[in-house]
Amino acid sequence: MVLFFSTRFLFFSIFFPCLISITLYQLDSFEPASLPADSLITSPTSIPPLLNDRFLTGAEFIGVGLLNNPEDIAYHKDSNLIYTGCVDGWVKRVSVHDSANDSIVEDWVNTGGRPLGIAFGLHGEVIVADANKGLLSISDGGKKTELLTDEADGVRFKLTDAVTVADNGVLYFTDASSKYDFYQFIFDFLEGKPHGRVMSFDPTTRATRVLLKDLYFANGISMSPDQTHFVFCETIMRRCSKYYISEERVEVFIQGLPGYPDNIRYDGDGHYWIALISEVTTSWKLSMKYLFLRKLIYMAAKYGVELLSIKNAAVLQVDLDGNPIAMYHDHPFSHITSGVKIGNHLYFGSLLHSYITRLDLLKYPAQKKL
């Protein structure tokens, strides 16, 4: 009797769940692909000489509870306002003051989607890369919202991510994935196939043109100061590349990043700031290498179980040649999606937090590592 009970217990508690799991694994159509060898080099090669690895010690928090996952940050110098897109669909405006406590948050325009990247057009309009809607233009003081484009070459955008504006008015933007939407972006990582594109939109001709395709989660994008090229990031590959506009040529800007890049911003003073949403954790290393692990993680994620660790996010400062200069991070802080330098402060956007984080770079500078 005891033996029968033990056998039945083992069957229902161990063997039966394993049998169900194996069956589900085999039936699921999700098939991850091997990643390029470059993405499997987990040791970072772009290490900055200066570091602040305790930036939360001096951090200030702006709009606590009023900014729901402010993913990107765009600063409008003339009005002294920050524009940011939140998960509830609002593009919000935040006043910039010496004291973080004096900042005022305004619900400006709700796109009805998920606003991510933000840039400013030549005629006062605010350009929004809305993950759900496509590329939008907000004008007339927020009274008019216009869809500029939501497809190219017959393929609709699934995750319109970031946008930058050239001096001639042409918009350059990314569609991170043509297969998975914003709420499924982790599946794009796990599948390991290049669904990303970089495109241009000409406001004069209204033409949308695909400049690059087959990218591994095309993310942040920023025009160069000399307007000859833009820099864009591929999150999965942990690299950023230059695209020379007139030559239609690509070259690596920086690779072997110490984390996964999100947005990139030029500060007008000879530097780019690259947000790294997470360091390369052990779970990321293993999943990128082993296909069966990625499928298991995918199946768990389908049922709301998160197995990938995202932590120790950062913002990396690099020069115009892609040489790393300084990095700001803090181990408990994750999901940094943008870093923007405004005056002497560095502002951090996030996919996780309900505020914008700010650090005084003069009081809390990055220093040489011992």
UniProtKB/Swiss-Prot annotation:
Glycans are attached at residue 101. GO terms for cellular component: cytosol; vacuole. The modification Phosphotyrosine is found at residue 303. It comes from the Eukaryota. It comes from Arabidopsis thaliana. Induction: First induced but later repressed transiently by jasmonic acid (MJ). Slight induction after wounding, both in local and systemic tissues. The keyword DNA-binding does not apply. PANTHER family: ADIPOCYTE PLASMA MEMBRANE-ASSOCIATED PROTEIN HEMOMUCIN-RELATED, STRICTOSIDINE SYNTHASE-RELATED. It is found in: Vacuole. Keywords: Glycoprotein, Phosphoprotein, Signal, Vacuole. Disulfide bonds: none annotated. Its main location: other. Belongs to the strictosidine synthase family. Residues 1-21 form the signal peptide. The keyword GTP-binding does not apply. This is Protein STRICTOSIDINE SYNTHASE-LIKE 4. Transmembrane segments: none annotated. One of its GO terms (biological process) is response to jasmonic acid. It holds the Pfam family Str_synth.
